[in-house]
Amino acid sequence: GKILAWGQSNSFDPNVREISDYTNTGTQIPYEPGSTLKTFTWAAAINEGKYNGTELTNGNSYCYGTDSQNNPIRATADNSLGCVYNAYRYQYGSVDFDTGLIYSLNSVAGTIQNEVITPDINLEYLRKFGFFKDVDTDGLPEATGTLNFTYPSDKLSLSFGQGSTVTMLQLMQAYSAVFSDGTM
């Protein structure tokens, strides 16, 4: 759909003629989207036909090592490069994938990206949703965000929205596809 209105903080004062900052926070200030990006990890798995919401998985911390292609894979804590935790380091035990989304579990997002699909497939879908490139909105200056996808920790973090940055406008565009059955 079209953007009909746009607003941001009340820092603009029409009575002040000398304006030092014309930054549009929605298009020019990238940020780590956090859990709002998990929707697209789940969407990639669903669209690939590999998602079973009732399938059980490990909802505890996701400790990881690497495979032969330097992608993150689940490992034991004492034989890992590091661990990703859920909020408050809570250990959920065995949960299904739907519950992983409901509770916004980082560990389940990592499992979906690294075991149900692959980090490369997830990245491909994020690009299709319009992340890491201009939205190309008429007349608005834009930042593209930053993609960190070099190390296993970067790839794992991308599944739950950390380590890379996007803009609010990119996120709105991507969610418009989710709410419109895939049409942006």
Locate each region found by the language model:
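Beta-lactam-recognizing serine transpeptidase/beta-lactamase-like catalytic domain environment
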Residues: 2-29, 40-184
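Structural signature of Gram-negative outer-membrane beta-barrels, strongest in the C-terminal barrel
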Residues: 30, 34-36
